[in-house]
């Protein structure tokens, strides 16, 4: 592509069914065709995740991974990691959006110097969320789309935000959010639409099942 590797940020995850496979990180590097991963996460608090976390710590020491983190872990599980780790997780990837802003979780993460990465940042594309009157009003005021207003809210909430996009025009629109700023009152108005609504329900049974599911990773090359 002509772009230096240092200019590209590669983030990926370890799947629970492979948590106890010592060579899985090396296999991941091979599949990605890279010498190192910028951010590696544990996908779910399933299976032997403490063992997998130790493997990630070793990968950091060996220069194969720059930073490590967690995905879909709750406070108790994160604390278990913190109590037993040598290298602290830098990021928690978890569902976060205006209907589920993760207020309490963010307080816990802030105390432990862990950043939140918002998964489902647009509420899984829920039109009810995206078309909330407050977003339509602010979109008209700032000359932006409702989606751009939501993404700007994430930025001002200090969330790392990862909206999915395949079309070039959508990618450009997603990053065209740094030439305006929501006021404190507008942020409060958005906070008022919190419904404590999740789109992903990680029941104990569902999470446990992930450790038994082995996707064909080689087939995904």
Give the positions of each predicted feature.
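Active-site catalytic pocket residues across diverse enzymes, especially alpha/beta-hydrolases
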Residues: 1-2, 85
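Conserved hydrophobic residue
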Residues: 3-4, 65
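Conserved H-loop
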Residues: 4-5, 88
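A short, structured active-site edge motif that brings together acidic residues
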Residues: 5-19, 38-45, 72
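Beta/alpha (TIM)-barrel catalytic core signal, keyed to glycine-rich beta->alpha loops juxtaposed to Asp/Glu
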Residues: 16, 44-221
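CE4/NodB-like, metal-dependent polysaccharide N-deacetylase domain
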Residues: 21-42, 58-62
